Every structure is written in C-alpha cells, then in structure tokens.
C-alpha cells in the first residue's frame, strides 16, 4: 500500500485558544495514538492532507516532525466543519510493520458482467472491504472480477479471497449482483402481452369458422 508523508510539528499547547490560532493559520490539529506514553499532539498544514482525505483511495501515513521523530500511522478519525467542510481535527494511530492492522480497502471491479451485456444492471452492495493484514501486504485496492456474472447471480466476499489479508466480513456477504433492469422487464411484459393477444385472436377465429361449418351441415 502506498504511503503519504505528512510534515508537522509538535504542539506546545492544546488549549482551545491555541487550537483556534492554529486553524486560523491554516494548520490542522492532530493527535497520534498508540505511541508510548501519552498521545502525541502535533499540527500540519491543511493542504498536506489533500491526497489523504479528498480521495477514494486509502494510504498509510508517514508522520515526520520538525524535531526529528518519524512515525508510521493510519488515519483513524477526521472531523469536518459542518458548513465549510474544512478539516477541523484528525486522529491517527501508530502502526508497526510486524503487527497486523485492520483497514477498509476500496473495491475495483474488473470486466463486464455477462448479465449486463444481456440487459441487466450491476448493483453494488459494498464499495469497500474491511480486511486485516500486515501493512506491507495490504493492497491499494481489491480487484473483483464480475465478467462471469449472469442476471440474478451475486459475487460474494469469498470470491476475492487473498493470502495477503483476512476479510472481516461473513462469507455470505455480497459485494455486487446483476439484477434485471426495469427497461428489460417492461420489454418482456410487452412481448408477453403481444403473444397473449395473438393467442386469443387466432384460435378463436378458427373455432368460430369450424362451428359455423358444422351448424350449416346440420341444417342440410
């Protein structure tokens, strides 16, 4: 998995006044958990989080402080301003290469489902999978091949198993499925109506003609 570097500096004060001053200066107050002792409070420029926050992708983080310390981490929580969507606060959690971590990884579909080619629609139940594994083994995204799915068929999480991570969902969890589209249903209904009309009209005419002939023969 790709890693993004965040350059920051330790916070000398964590009070409300100091936090407000940081935000006014374009800085984001952050906390790193999982370190020895107390959580580490630091701040970094808001623009440095652009490729970490405003993206559908996920990354690990390398936090580098001006004092020289460096930490590997993952984003744990983020708070946004309710009106401006500006980043108010970010929590990180320190990770270690030899210890497994749990993350939500994006799903990328591959191929065109057979059912879609026949008029169906691919519906997603999940866009990300929660998996657990070593940081170095976790992928940037998980590939889900849907090319063999027919209308009515589903792709389960067991279809994207990997030796590199353990999926944290029940085996019967559905990633996506091919369903009949509304247009296809309407078209099939119209075809059935036409068949019913034809079936009602033709046999009725033949029966009426035969009955008329027999009736004429009886009178003679």
From Swiss-Prot:
CDD domains: Ribosomal_L25_TL5_CTC. Residues 186-220 are annotated as: Disordered. One of its GO terms (cellular component) is cytosolic large ribosomal subunit. Residues 186-199 have a biased composition (Acidic residues). GO terms for molecular function: 5S rRNA binding; structural constituent of ribosome. GO terms for biological process: translation. Residues 211-220 have a biased composition (Basic and acidic residues). Keywords: Ribonucleoprotein, Ribosomal protein, RNA-binding, rRNA-binding. Disulfide bonds: none annotated. HAMAP family: Ribosomal_bL25_CTC (MF_01334). Part of the 50S ribosomal subunit; part of the 5S rRNA/L5/L18/L25 subcomplex. Contacts the 5S rRNA. Binds to the 5S rRNA independently of L5 and L18. This is one of the proteins that binds to the 5S RNA in the ribosome where it forms part of the central protuberance. Belongs to the bacterial ribosomal protein bL25 family. CTC subfamily. This is Large ribosomal subunit protein bL25. The lineage of its organism: Bacteria, Pseudomonadati, Bacteroidota, Flavobacteriia, Flavobacteriales. The gene is rplY.
């Amino acid at each position: 998995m790709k890693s993004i570097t965040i350059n920051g500096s330790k916070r000398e004060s964590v009070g409300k006044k100091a936090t407000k001053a940081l935000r006014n200066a374009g800085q984001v107050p952050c906390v790193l958990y999982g370190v020895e002792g107390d959580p580490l409070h630091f701040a970094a420029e808001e623009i440095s989080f652009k490729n970490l926050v405003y993206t559908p992708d996920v990354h690990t983080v390398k936090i580098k402080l001006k004092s020289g310390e460096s930490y590997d981490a993952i984003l744990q929580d983020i708070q946004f301003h309710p009106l401006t969507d500006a980043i108010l606060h970010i929590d990180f959690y320190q990770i270690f290469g030899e210890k497994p971590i749990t993350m939500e990884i994006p799903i990328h579909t591959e191929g065109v489902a057979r059912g879609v080619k026949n008029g169906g629609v691919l519906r997603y139940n999940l866009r990300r999978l929660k998996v657990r594994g070593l940081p170095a083994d976790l992928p940037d995204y998980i590939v889900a091949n849907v090319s063999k799915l027919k209308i009515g068929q589903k792709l389960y999480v067991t279809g994207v198993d990997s030796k590199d991570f353990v999926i944290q969902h029940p085996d019967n969890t559905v990633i996506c499925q091919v369903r009949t589209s509304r247009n296809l249903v309407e078209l099939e209904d119209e075809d059935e109506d036409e068949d019913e009309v034809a079936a009602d009209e033709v046999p009725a005419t033949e029966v009426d003609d035969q009955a008329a002939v027999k009736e004429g023969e009886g009178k003679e």
